[in-house]
Regions:
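Generic structural signal for buried aliphatic residues
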Residues: 91-93, 196-198
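Short, compositionally biased
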Residues: 104-120
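Active-site cores enriched in adjacent His and Asp/Glu residues with nearby glycine-rich loops
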Residues: 21-87, 136-178, 190-194
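A conserved acidic, glycine/proline-rich C-terminal tail/linker
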Residues: 182-188, 204
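Single conserved hydrophobic/aromatic residue that forms the stacking wall/gate
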Residues: 197-206
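N-terminal glycine-rich anion-binding loops that anchor highly charged ligand groups
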Residues: 12-24
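Short, Lys/Arg- and Gly-enriched loop/turn segments at beta-strand edges
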Residues: 99-106, 204
Length: 206
């Protein structure tokens, strides 16, 4: 069932999302050659706790870390460890924080030093596709309108959409309905209403 939040719940979620976004920004600042993914994860863990929140990913379905850090060909759900970042890597960091019983969840991809023009284009197109999708996150539109916009933009720039993973609702649980694919025909799926919280998570491939 799709959960629509009331104003009190939205305020709590805004706080949770601000903490999550700040944790993601911290991770991005640490992406540089010579740093291990475990070091980034530890810093994010400590920051989230310092904000009175808890790392949502840690222990979720047995996941052993506070972040998902995926490098280069790894699409999502990379487990932090002793891998050392090197020049030219592209590094996706996914973070979740729970505060007041509600969850924030966000991700971004960062360049480690100088990267190839193709890798930079991948990052740029993926980020812009997120905003293209958000343009259709409006009351009365259909969920599939978002994915259609994302897919159309990405494919127009020579990339493909990863269909195995989708965005999702978020709230008291990290994964709530509805699913938000990054592809599809417009005009399908549930209609969006005010105070529906969902996460659009564009993932791309060369």
């Amino acid at each position: 069932m799709i959960s629509v939040k009331n104003e009190r719940e939205l305020e709590i979620m805004r706080k949770a999302c601000k903490i999550t976004a700040a944790a993601r920004a911290l991770a991005g600042e640490m992406v540089r050659p010579g740093v291990t993914t475990k070091q980034i994860d530890k810093a994010v863990y400590e920051f989230i706790l310092s904000q009175g929140a808890k790392p949502t990913f840690l222990g979720y379905g047995g996941f052993p870390a506070s972040t998902c850090i995926s490098i280069n060909e790894v699409v999502i759900h990379g487990i932090p460890g002793n891998r050392v970042l090197k020049e030219g890597d592209i590094v996706s960091v996914d973070v979740g924080a729970t505060w007041g019983g509600f969850t924030g969840d966000c991700a971004a991809t960062f360049a480690c030093g100088a990267i190839s023009p193709t890798a930079q284009k991948l990052i740029t197109v993926t980020e812009q596709s997120f905003y293209e999708g958000i343009k259709f996150a409006r009351q009365g539109n259909r969920i599939s309108d978002i994915g259609h916009a994302v897919q159309t933009y990405v494919e127009s720039h020579g990339f493909g959409v990863v269909r195995a993973f989708v965005g999702h609702g978020v709230g008291e649980k990290m994964h709530e309905e509805p699913e938000v694919p990054n592809y599809g025909s417009p005009g399908r799926g549930p209609r969006m209403v005010l105070s529906l919280i969902h996460i659009s998570e564009p993932t791309r491939q060369f």
